[in-house]
Amino acid sequence: MKDKFENINLTICKVSVLTDDVRLYLRTKDGEPFGNFNALRQELNNNDKELSFAMNAGMYHPDLSPVGHFKEEYNEKKKVVSKPGPGNFGMLPNGIFCIGSNWLNVYETFDYLDKTPKCNYATQSGPMLVLNNRLHPRFLKESKSKFIRNGVGTSADKKYAYFVKAEDTVNFYTFARIFKEKLKAPNALYFDGKISRLYSKELNRNDFGWPMGPILAVVRSKD
């Protein structure tokens, strides 16, 4: 749905683990990266499924492989990266979005390693936007670094996830406040900036751009 926070236009998708089939995708059955929403939509269509909603879901290398941890249908494709490093991904604390059998949650990376939750799907990104109801300590209110951004937050009961794309440029501080203040998400994770893209059948929207790595998708069976 379309929404707004202060002067920032937003697109927000709220999903429920009770009613929505939420998944992560990276490669086709032939082992090639999907790279875009159309390729994923076509493969789903070939399997009597349809793509309801999707967005880029985690940072990736030039070959479209994930920078951090990635798990698909219980299979670990990339191990957890816990060391600090360059760029937004390495701005600790970073985190992992995890899809369980009947729950959804954003974990701080070391918390994830400590608890070892049983995730059907998982994707690591960074930085954390909100951690235990607090904004990331390195975010600056007056920062001039503004980009189109997207991310995910989860509800306290782990039944809902909020996927948000800012349609206007925004700094980290304000983007994190959207999850904390507007959506009341105790934990939220940044996905990306410049390449942020979204697919929504309901909104008749299919953003085009450079090839992407991990893709978050809400999938439905064909009627």
Task: Please describe what each predicted stretch is.
Residues L51-F53, G95-I96, L104-N105, P127-M128, ...:
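Structural motif
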Residues R27-E32, D111-K115, K165-T169:
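Short, solvent-exposed aromatic-acidic interface loops
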Residues M1-N88:
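Zymogen propeptides
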Residues S16-T19, C98-W103, L131-N133, T154-K159, ...:
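Short acidic-glycine loop/turn motifs at beta-strand connectors
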Residues S65-F139:
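Active-site-adjacent helix-turn-beta-strand microarchitecture at beta-sheet edges
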Residues I8, M91-P93, S145-R149:
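Short, surface-exposed coil-to-beta transition loops
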Residues V67-G85, R138-N150, T154-N187, S196-D223:
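Conserved, well-ordered active-site substructure
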